[in-house]
Regions:
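Class II aminoacyl-tRNA synthetase catalytic cores and aaRS-like
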Residues: 1-214
Length: 214
């Protein structure tokens, strides 16, 4: 645990040094705020002075973005706690830390290059590994076509393949209606000569459902 805490400190210090070098200012924003529409429920803090009224802890740090931007802070960041009252999952918890970077008068490539540089600096400082940039990039359409999701894990060597032609004359209603309605049928090729037993397929079906798939 000590090693993890030290690495976390190194990541934060590297982040601050990098962003300050790139003309960002670190801005501290209030925790006690009004409730705003977000993706989860707010954690509420009762007000002692205003009976029956509550503050809301921030779900994301962008609440003050417009005020800061029009006040002249065209580049700022904060490393801040966020709070979301939602069901626990493997990748969800009620309190987490977020690195928030906001900057004006930039285009998409400028944003990507800035973040690539930050990640490269963090990995070099914390792990001693030199990462090559720019990172490989694929567009949304290509990602959906090849992987079926917009944020694929490219370490997984499987890609979706279109097999609609195989089922052109199929009487299986699921495939038949899909093709008739202009849809396509895709499959995920499995190596090892397709040696999957029925039990293995059933086990995989149960497993993917834990990720709310299928």
């Amino acid at each position: 645990m000590q090693e993890t805490i030290i690495k976390r400190h190194e990541v934060m210090q590297t982040t601050r040094n990098y962003l300050v070098k790139h003309r960002f200012h670190e801005v501290e924003i209030p925790f006690l705020n009004k409730s705003t529409p977000e993706g989860a429920r707010d954690f509420l803090v009762p007000s002692r002075i205003n009976k029956g009224e509550f503050y809301a802890l921030p779900q994301s740090p962008q609440t003050f973005k417009q005020i800061l931007m029009v006040s002249g802070f065209d580049r700022y960041f904060n490393i801040i706690k966020c709070f979301r009252d939602e069901d626990l999952r493997n990748d969800r918890q009620p309190e987490f830390t977020q690195i928030d970077m906001e900057f004006s008068f930039v285009n998409q490539n400028m944003v990507i290059e800035c973040i690539e540089g930050l990640l490269k600096e963090i990995v070099k400082t914390v792990k001693g590994i030199e990462v090559q940039t720019p990172f490989p990039r694929i567009g949304y359409d290509e990602a959906m076509e090849r992987f079926g999701k917009d944020a694929p894990d490219t370490r997984i060597p499987f890609e979706l393949k279109t097999i609609s032609d195989i089922f052109t004359n199929s009487e299986f209603n699921v495939f038949k209606s899909t093709i008739a309605n202009g849809g396509i049928i895709k499959a995920l090729p499995v190596k090892d000569d397709g040696k999957l037993s029925r039990k293995m397929v059933d086990d995989y079906t149960v497993w993917v459902k834990t990720f709310r798939a299928g």
